[in-house]
């Protein structure tokens, strides 16, 4: 039986509002200020807010599914769920095992005597879910988006990003990281853990120096380097890539052509793969193994890992309960099995119908907006409209569910189950290489509170779990839904026309469909938006700024999303003027709903980490900086030059 939105859930929760803050000065804190004042971040979380609360609800729903699933025959999907969860929840068995599960793989690392053996071992580790030196996935070929091709990219780091290894601002984190590495290796039985940790940090610093930075990796053209395997191997002498493939369980023939996303990384890392560095590489491999396995080992390992990744990096003081971590494991390994039941219990057909209408109106709003753009030539408009017409939309859940029949889950074998689940997913990915694209595949489960745009498939996807308040409320007025899920839809469509998506055509092919003049006009507008965000500093971290170049794609998505949602709401009204509700006009309610979506309270440590690594701007700016660029917001609330949110008209950015 599907569940619909509770009719008692308010469309706008006025108890969250802070009327001491004028909407014209700070929309975000006007709508969320009272909520922020009374809300404490749970001790097992780095943040709380609209997204987190929905994720908590989804987590509880998944736990209910896992713990109430009817036992099935051995090997059935139901039994796999039960056995995997039980293997994690048997804390006594995990504690009794201690560090013993690490003994055999650590001995294999210690026995490595050549670079070739090392690279083969790293390949095997990658296959089994251990952090590796390279990332690998099968994805649409940007030059021929009807087929899958193998992508390989940079990896090998235990810190969040390459800049953590080089910038003075992260010196304290580097010290804490070294202490964590030493502590983990000591738990694993290393008597020289301090020296091993020094070797790990030194080697990872060298690996980080080979990495492309975050902004450079946003350039899809620079990242698309299709080449035969032989050419790739010739470009990175000293890197026995075929040995790594063999470790993965993949032949050179199966790899065929591949896309090398950061070619210089492989060339430079090959220079680090020398016999004299083997001791350091063994230390790094041991650390990667221990770190990756720690969440599934005895509590001393779990707490050691959480102390750094949870507390130092994110500020979270307390590890979340074991059942929540068990749910995470099942979600990662058997997500679509759980998703089938989640949809049956929690997805309303009414939501699907209203979403279809919302999407249709957002598409029409984009069509009208593109047609009326003054800065774009008719030639490029025609191609933009062609791309818009080819958008594919997926709502709620997949029409074809993933087949887990070959995934073996063994009762009581937690680490084995983790390794087999990772290997199953890797082999499923590798098997796609060279095959036609599966257009029905989803890259998120229905119980995921998120949405995405895929530039190489030109599709927007909205899982069932995001179709809940404050994003979507089937009992709410249109204005609230257009300011919430409507802007999310517009945001995802907008990614098709952001700095990355605009380099792909309607078929997902990496191809320039712009005139030079139009591309220049587009980039002039995006430069202004980059500069706006570069100037912003969160209240919590005034010593740090938003990286406008890193966040430009999401900022374009937000700006287009809200602007087009506003237009789509007008289309939906068909000339009618909606009545005011709770003292607010429909125009005002749309913008108030937009602000409610970004309701967030985060720990300082997490804010700092996200400013350094996240392509999304902080919530307060996703709300406030966007409305400063939207003329309709000024009209809705009579914003004037003396108000804090005022932005001079010639400084406002309008792209789509």
List PLM regions with ranges:
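Hydrophobic/aromatic-rich, well-ordered segments within soluble, folded domains that form packed cores
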Residues: 16-37, 164-186, 552, 558-564
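Short secondary-structure subsegments characteristic of cysteine-rich extracellular domains
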Residues: 43-66, 193-210, 481-487, 582, ...
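Intrinsically disordered, low-complexity linker/terminal regions across diverse proteins
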Residues: 2-5, 235-239, 259, 263, ...
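Extracellular/periplasmic catalytic domains that process cell-envelope and extracellular macromolecules
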Residues: 19-23, 142-144, 453-456, 583-585
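Conserved phosphate-chemistry cores used by DNA topoisomerases
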Residues: 11-14
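Active-site-surrounding "flap" and adjacent substrate/cofactor-binding loops of secreted or lumenal enzymes
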Residues: 5-8, 19-26, 30-93
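Short, solvent-exposed loop/turn and secondary-structure capping segments
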Residues: 38-42, 137, 161-163, 211-213, ...
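Noncatalytic, helix-rich "gating/capping" subdomain that lines the substrate-entry/channel surface
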Residues: 67-357, 361
